[in-house]
Structures are given as C-alpha cells and as structure tokens.
C-alpha cells in the first residue's frame, strides 16, 4: 500500500479562492472589508516568517491587514493596551498575537485580553470552552484546518480509533476535542504516556504534534490509517521533515500529510475563515 498525499496547499488555495470571492461580493454589496490585526513582538526569525505568510494571505483574499511590529523590549502593559485599542476598533474583526512571546510577557494574560469575538486564533478560554461544550464558533486554527484535511479524504470518522500525540494548548488539546466532536474514540498521548508504540499502532487516525523530527517510526503506523503530521523540523542539512518517519509511514498509511505542504497552509486558511466568520456573525 502506498498512501495518498493529502495536499494541504491545494485545499488551502481553494479556500482562499472562495474567501476572495466572498470578499468581492461584500464589496460589491457595499459592505465593509474584513480586517485582521497581526501583532508581532520581537525579532524571532521563525515568527517573522509565519507573520509574513499570514499578512500576505490576508492581502491575497482582499482583507484589510493591520500590522503591529513591536520590539522585544515592549512591556506587557503596552501590549495589553494595544490589544485594548484593537478590541475597540470597528475596522478590526480579528486579532492575532504571534506566539511565542518574550519571557517577560504572560501569554495567557495576552490571550485572555483579546475579545472572544475577535479571537480568530481560537485560543481564548471562552472559545476553547465552547468547543468542549460541542457548540464551537471560532475554533483553534490548526485543529480546524486538520479537520478540513480529514474531511477531504472522504473517510467517515465516526467510530474511528484516533490518537493524538502531543497535548499542547495550541494543537493537541483542541485537536482531541475536535476528534471527539467528529465521533472518534480519542486517546491523547503526552510525555507521561506509557507504551506509546502500542497506542500508535491501534490508531485508525493519527495526529502527531510534538516538534521532534521522525519521532514516530513509520513502521508503527497501522495499515490503512490516516496520518496527520503537524511537525515541521529543520535538519542540519537544511531539509524540512515532520514528526513522523514519512517514507516508511507512506508505505503503510492510506492517507498522509506531507511536510511541508500539508498542515501548515491549512492553519493560515483557517485563520482567514475565522476572520470572515467574525466579520459576518459578530461585527456586520
């Protein structure tokens, strides 16, 4: 068996085209253009790349993108004050604060300062709580994008044994909630998990998000499984690889996401979807 690649680039491109058409229709109807505020604190190279991609995607679909690039010496109070201004700005539908933040800034306090109706990253406890209560509105972008990828396979998720490796607030925990909502029997594995191999081998649907190259050996993959690799790791030779040993896993899985070109583009596409949702449902 050779797995079918789940092409995140193509799916994200189709989403952006749909969003662009909707923005054009709004303009023609005399409605406001959706707006996204993107806040970057410091000069972390990876964060600068991610933020640049998000700003470019905003412009491609016709959103208004407001950029705030702050020095890493910015105080927590100054950052919170900026968020307050964005919260009250009627031209802004979504606020994105690029993580991680400098050590002197409490990221939890920053996330909670963003108004839930402008929390297009889906990190605010209110929005995570709604997902847990099975009434989601603004969903965490990476898990939301992953669910779009899974749906693209045409596989019925109800009753699948799903395993999530990684329990971060950004991916692992909301991913578990999304899979429960999709009817899976879900196991979440983390650093205290015993017998990880046994659990992975049982997975009809595997999502790995740990940030360690080739953390999951390919021969652990259950034949016919769906494998979603969230990791993106740069090796010493410059290659980008995921958290799963791709070449071996691809010989066993039915569907697998490549790295790069799998999950990454979908995170940005979901951010754009959330921003339009906020504009249409909260701010029009």
Swiss-Prot record:
What organism is listed for this UniProt entry?
Shewanella amazonensis (strain ATCC BAA-1098 / SB2B)
Q: Which reaction does it catalyse?
A: (6R)-5,10-methylene-5,6,7,8-tetrahydrofolate + NADP(+) = (6R)-5,10-methenyltetrahydrofolate + NADPH; (6R)-5,10-methenyltetrahydrofolate + H2O = (6R)-10-formyltetrahydrofolate + H(+)
Provide the function of this protein: Catalyzes the oxidation of 5,10-methylenetetrahydrofolate to 5,10-methenyltetrahydrofolate and then the hydrolysis of 5,10-methenyltetrahydrofolate to 10-formyltetrahydrofolate.
**Pfam families, alphabetically?**
THF_DHG_CYH, THF_DHG_CYH_C
- What GO molecular-function term can you cite, just one? methenyltetrahydrofolate cyclohydrolase activity
List of residues binding NADP(+): 166-168, 232
Lineage, broadest ranks: Bacteria, Pseudomonadati, Pseudomonadota, Gammaproteobacteria, Alteromonadales
Q: Tell me the route in metabolism or biology where this protein functions.
A: One-carbon metabolism; tetrahydrofolate interconversion
| Gene Ontology cellular-component terms listed | cytosol
Which Gene3D superfamilies does the protein's record reference?
A: Leucine Dehydrogenase, chain A, domain 1 (3.40.50.10860), NAD(P)-binding Rossmann-like Domain (3.40.50.720)
Q: How does it assemble?
A: Homodimer.
**The protein's name:** Bifunctional protein FolD
Q: Report whether Hydrolase shows up as a keyword of the record.
A: yes
Q: Which residues form a coiled coil?
A: none
Family recorded in the similarity comment: Belongs to the tetrahydrofolate dehydrogenase/cyclohydrolase family.
Query: What InterPro entries does the entry give?
Result: Aminoacid_DH-like_N_sf, NAD(P)-bd_dom_sf, THF_DH/CycHdrlase, THF_DH/CycHdrlase_cat_dom, THF_DH/CycHdrlase_CS, THF_DH/CycHdrlase_NAD-bd_dom
Give EC number(s), comma-separated.
Answer: 1.5.1.5, 3.5.4.9
BP GO terms, sorted: L-histidine biosynthetic process; methionine biosynthetic process; purine nucleotide biosynthetic process; tetrahydrofolate interconversion
Q: Which UniProt keywords apply?
A: Amino-acid biosynthesis, Histidine biosynthesis, Hydrolase, Methionine biosynthesis, Multifunctional enzyme, NADP, One-carbon metabolism, Oxidoreductase, Purine biosynthesis
């Amino acid at each position: 068996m050779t797995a079918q690649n789940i092409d995140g680039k193509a799916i994200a491109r189709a989403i952006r085209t749909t969003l662009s058409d909707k923005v054009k229709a709004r303009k023609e109807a005399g409605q406001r253009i959706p707006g996204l505020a993107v806040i970057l604190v410091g000069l972390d190279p990876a964060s600068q790349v991610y933020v640049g991609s998000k700003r470019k995607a905003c412009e491609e679909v016709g959103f208004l993108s407001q950029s705030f690039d702050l020095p890493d010496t910015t105080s927590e109070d100054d950052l919170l004050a900026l968020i307050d201004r964005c919260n009250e700005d009627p031209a802004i539908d979504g606020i994105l604060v690029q993580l991680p933040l400098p050590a002197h800034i409490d990221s939890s306090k920053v996330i909670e300062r963003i108004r839930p109706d402008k929390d297009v990253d889906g990190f605010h406890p209110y929005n995570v709580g709604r997902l847990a209560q099975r009434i989601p509105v603004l969903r965490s972008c990476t898990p939301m994008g992953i669910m779009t990828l899974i749906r693209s396979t045409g596989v019925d998720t109800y009753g699948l044994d799903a395993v999530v490796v990684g329990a971060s607030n950004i991916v692992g925990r909301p991913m578990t909630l999304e899979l429960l909502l999709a009817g899976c029997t879900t196991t979440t594995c983390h650093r205290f998990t015993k017998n990880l191999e046994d659990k992975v081998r049982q997975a009809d649907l595997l999502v790995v998000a740990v940030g360690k190259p080739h953390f999951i050996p390919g021969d652990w993959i259950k034949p016919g499984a769906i494998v979603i690799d969230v990791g993106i790791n740069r090796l010493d030779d410059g290659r980008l690889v995921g958290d799963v040993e791709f070449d071996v896993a691809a010989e066993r899985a039915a569907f697998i996401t490549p790295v790069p070109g799998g999950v990454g583009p979908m995170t940005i596409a979901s951010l754009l979807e959330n921003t339009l949702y906020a504009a249409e449902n909260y701010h029009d």
